[in-house]
Amino acid sequence: MAGYSVKLTKLIKEYHLEQIWVPENLDEIVIETAELNRPGLQFAGFYKYFDPERIQIIGKSEFGYLSGLSREKRLEMVDLYFSKQPKVVITTWNLTITKELGALGEKYSVPILRTSEGTSEFMAALTVSLSVALAKR
């Protein structure tokens, strides 16, 4: 039996997510897992258990880590991350998206969205919503 899915556009509307960069096929992107990921370990180079199907949530900790890297190293790590083509990247706390980050979203066709909500609150609400929508019936 096929699993359930939620259109990314539904989540954008439900959570009033700002679209920083989105591909032309935005209406075709579906989320099929309630699992979320904060990519701090990926920015440090660890990909062993990385699942690009998960919604990626970038908050203050991830931005803080990246800002501590040299520009060259930061670009290298973020390019590697986007090359894995995560389903969608959502930043929290209304964090400023650099032109570099936006360009990598476009380069790898990865939607980049933003919310003004705090990371924990947003993740909790999103997890509940996805768990209900994707639950076995």
Language model features with spans:
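Gly/Thr-rich phosphate-binding loop signature of adenosyl cofactor/nucleotide-binding cores
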Residues: 1-82
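Feature captures the catalytic cores and cofactor-binding loops of soluble hydro-lyases/lyases
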Residues: 46-57, 61-136
